[in-house]
């Protein structure tokens, strides 16, 4: 009888421990968490700004626990980037940028405004000098304001601002990162990791969710509406001169 009781106690204790371990594992990997994945693609312009305003407001209203911005953009309008940066900074939800291809110019500014940055192995970020629509360098006043904005974005997320400044100011000298004086800084994933501009390098979304301990979270993928697609097309700087 005593042996039987000991066996039952052992079985119960083992089962209880496994149950607790399983529950803790679920919590640790995002069980009952809600994650919004919002794309930042193509040019940064007013249409993208409106899309991000709508989707981040929706994420907030739905009680999202995390927002992931999947970034692939060559850059775009400085004014729209500034407004989107404010939208991101005003969020009370943890944010992560996943650079799937490139976050150049205004794209790097947006990434720097998020809490975390992860990069695909072939991704790049930087090259953020301000140019006019005809491809010439902007005036000194505009350049100075943009450099200050890049610095502020880096500082807001606890990153060393000298690299953000070098992305926007070709007068900086960082030859060890392939950006001697006269060149804008562009970071590879390994370089971004080295200077503290990326938390990790991941090949896909599954790996990213694992790194963020959100593997078991409920995922909501945001997408543009037809009206937003039209608005983005009409706001494209290539299209505007034709209209």
Please place each PLM-identified region on the residue numbering.
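Positively charged n-region of N-terminal signal peptides that target proteins for export
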Residues: 1-5
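Bacterial N-terminal signal peptides
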Residues: 6-17
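Soluble extramembrane regions of membrane proteins in the secretory/endomembrane system
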Residues: 20-234
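Core alpha-helical transmembrane segments of integral membrane proteins
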Residues: 234-243
């Amino acid at each position: 009888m005593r042996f039987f009781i000991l066996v039952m106690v052992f079985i119960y204790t083992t089962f209880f421990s496994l149950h607790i371990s399983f529950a803790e594992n679920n919590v640790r990997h995002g069980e009952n968490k809600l994650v919004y994945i919002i794309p930042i693609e193509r040019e940064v312009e007013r249409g993208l700004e409106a899309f991000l305003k709508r989707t981040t407001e929706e994420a907030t209203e739905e009680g999202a626990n995390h927002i992931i911005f999947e970034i692939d953009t060559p850059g775009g309008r400085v004014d729209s980037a500034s407004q989107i940066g404010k939208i991101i900074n005003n969020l009370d939800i943890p944010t992560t940028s996943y650079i799937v291809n490139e976050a150049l110019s205004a794209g790097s500014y947006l990434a720097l405004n998020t809490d975390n940055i992860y990069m695909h192995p072939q991704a790049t970020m930087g090259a953020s000098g301000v140019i006019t629509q005809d491809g010439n360098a902007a005036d000194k006043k505009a350049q100075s304001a943009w450099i200050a904005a890049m610095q502020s974005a880096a500082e807001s997320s606890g990153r060393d601002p000298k690299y953000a400044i070098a992305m926007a100011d070709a007068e900086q000298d960082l030859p060890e990162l392939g950006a001697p004086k006269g060149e804008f800084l562009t970071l590879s994933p390994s370089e971004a990791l080295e200077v503290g501009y990326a938390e990790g390098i991941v090949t896909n979304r599954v790996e990213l969710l694992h790194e963020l301990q959100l593997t078991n979270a409920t995922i909501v993928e945001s997408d543009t509406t037809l009206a937003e697609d039209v608005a983005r097309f009409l706001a494209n700087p290539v299209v505007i001169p034709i209209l």
